[in-house]
Structure formats: C-alpha cells, structure tokens
C-alpha cells in the first residue's frame, strides 16, 4: 500500500490542524535555542503539507527543503511562501519519503510531523531520513496536538464504520513509540521533550467537530465509501446532538506539543 496523499484535503487542512500560537511559539523557541540556525542551517521536512511548520522555521533563519506527495499541498505551500517573500529559503519538491531524491548526509535536521502514521513502508522512510542526515544530524518527531479534532468522536466514527463492514487501511504506525523502537534497533538514541508551557486546552464546538467529519476533513475518512460515511455521520449526529444541551455546546480537549529527538 502506498503512502497516503492529502490531495483533496487542502481546503480545510490548516483550519482543522490548529494549535495554540503561544505554546507553538514556546516550542519553536526551545527548538531554535537547542539547534540554532547558525549551526544547523539545513532542514528537511518530508510531508511539508501547507508549510505550517516549514514557514515558521524559515522565519527563524533555517533553509528548509519541504517534500510532499500531494501536489495540491505543495502548490499551497509554495503560494504561502511567496506571499511571505520566503521562497528563497524554502524549496518545495514533490517526492515520497520512502525514496528521497536527495544526497546522503546533506541535512542537519529532519522534522517529521505526524508523518509515519500515513506511510505503509514507514521503516523505509525512517532509513531514508537517517541517510540524508549528516553524522551529527537529528531526526525530530514533532507532535502538534489534535487541532480541531475531538478524539472520542473520531474513534466513534471508526467504530461505527467497522460495525457497517468497512475495514480501514493500515497505512503506518499506530504510535510514535514504534519509530523510537525501530531507530533504537539501528543504533540511535531518543530523547523526549515535554514542557508545561506547551500544554493547552482547546474548546471545540460540537457541531463544528461533526461538520469536519461530515466534510471528510481528516485522512481516515478519505476512502470510506459514501454509503458507509453518511450512515456513520447520521449515527454520530443522533448520538451526540440528542445528549448535548445545544448544537453550540463546546467540548474541552486537552492538547500539547511534544518533541522527540533521535540521533546517534
């Protein structure tokens, strides 16, 4: 099974992958202090998407190469880069992370944001990222929170779909710990970093959350057949709206940013 493309999800991507600006800025401050661009200038981001991580890195002085298999995502990333007059510091290439068209030992940092959940041969992607890092380079696994997602609604969507006979494709890892264990088997060490100032609570409107699922804003809904999808949405609407005080009810979702550093 191939890596999952986010073509078709571009319109709602940034809207549904939000994070607290203050917490994100704090995390980027930590990253910049730990890996100053004067010493670690060349950054690779496979799965660059719309550039929501790459562009802040460029603004901090890094030279970023962003890869994605989604042409729609790359077009939006390039447009946003031009709008910020940052295109000289961000190179966008269409490529699959399992076959990087890049020289070995050519990057100081490689940033992967939730990426390995969407690559069937994720071990090959890990090996490729380690290959293009220089001997003192670091693979950075960055978790930016749930965005506009309500985890229990997503889980219930998948439960109902399975009850209706749909089998979800198993694209990649189920947990980042699989990546950590795999890199350990290759002789790499991992360091997890969590900070209290990287935690926040997101208030999400119930109807908005249901609408995002209805509109297939998340990758796991992308290939669900229409008949199953709409039956699931009807079930979710019935289960949740009848129990809520109003469709405008808000759900509080704990969120956090975490960083895992993998290096020799």
List each model region and its residues:
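Short alpha-helix
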Residues: 171-187
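Conserved class I S-adenosyl-L-methionine
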Residues: 1-41, 52-56, 73-76, 80-85, 138-170
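A short SAM/SAH-binding and catalytic strip from SAM-dependent methyltransferases
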Residues: 108-121
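Class I SAM-dependent methyltransferase SAM/SAH-binding core
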Residues: 42-46, 50-99
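Conserved Class I S-adenosyl-L-methionine
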Residues: 50, 190-264
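A short glycine-rich, Lys/Arg-flanked "PGG" loop and its adjoining helix->strand segment in the class I
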Residues: 123-135
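A short acidic, Gly/Pro-enriched loop at the edge of an enzyme's catalytic core
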Residues: 98-110
């Amino acid at each position: 099974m191939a890596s999952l493309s986010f073509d078709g999800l571009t319109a709602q991507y940034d809207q549904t992958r939000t994070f607290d600006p203050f917490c994100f800025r704090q995390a980027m401050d930590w990253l910049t202090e730990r890996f100053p661009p004067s010493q670690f200038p060349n950054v690779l981001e496979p799965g660059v998407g719309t550039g929501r991580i790459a562009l802040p890195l460029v603004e901090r002085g890094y030279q970023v190469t962003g890869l994605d298999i989604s042409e729609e995502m790359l077009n939006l990333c390039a447009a946003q880069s031009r709008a910020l007059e940052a295109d000289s510091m961000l190179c966008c290439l269409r490529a699959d992370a399992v076959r990087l068209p890049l020289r070995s030992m050519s990057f100081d940092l490689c940033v992967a944001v939730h990426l390995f959940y969407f690559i069937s041969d994720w071990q090959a992607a890990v090996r490729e990222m380690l290959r293009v890092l220089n001997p003192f380079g670091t693979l950075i696994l960055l978790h930016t929170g749930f965005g506009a997602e309500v985890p229990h609604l997503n889980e219930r969507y998948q439960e109902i779909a399975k009850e209706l006979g749909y089998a979800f494709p198993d694209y990649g890892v189920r947990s980042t710990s699989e990546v950590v264990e795999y890199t350990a088997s290759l002789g790499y060490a991992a360091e997890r970093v969590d900070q209290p100032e990287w935690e926040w609570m997101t208030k999400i409107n119930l109807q908005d959350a249901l609408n995002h699922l209805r509109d297939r804003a998340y990758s796991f809904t992308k290939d669900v057949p229409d008949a199953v999808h709409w039956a699931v949405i009807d079930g979710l609407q019935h289960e949740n709206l009848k129990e809520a005080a109003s469709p405008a009810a808000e759900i509080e979702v704990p969120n956090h940013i975490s960083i895992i550093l993998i290096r020799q």
